[in-house]
């Protein structure tokens, strides 16, 4: 199944916020709980602002493996300012090229969905929202839908 790069770029642009700071973190968590519903216990969630960890949630049905995936997905978003699913789409036909072309290790980076940039309309990418525990596209969609939800509260 081909992943649509243009759709993902569109999602990243659509999810831009007017503002996001420490006061907004709780609102994002509430959105994640509301949208994730019964899946909230199945996921780990990491929120970063300027590469600083400002929130972490480990669902009751998660393990340390989810923490490892969170770290790898976060590294992709931090390095490329795009969602980890976008990077997966670029290298879908040859994932090894991602690691070779960028001199990166599979130990520290993973091109699977679930890492999503937090961006502002005025300044660009200022953080990341990382989800791990569902399928990679479900992780991506949960992050995207939660950002769209708090965006709707800002307008």
Swiss-Prot record:
Q: Which Pfam families match?
A: HbpS-like
InterPro entries named among the record's database cross-references? PduO/GlcC-like, PduO/GlcC-like_sf, YBR137W-like
Q: Which NCBIfam families match?
A: PRK02487.1-5 (NF002696)
Family according to the record? Belongs to the UPF0303 family.
Q: What is the designated name of this protein?
A: UPF0303 protein lp_3613
Organism whose genome encodes this protein: Lactiplantibacillus plantarum (strain ATCC BAA-793 / NCIMB 8826 / WCFS1) (Lactobacillus plantarum)
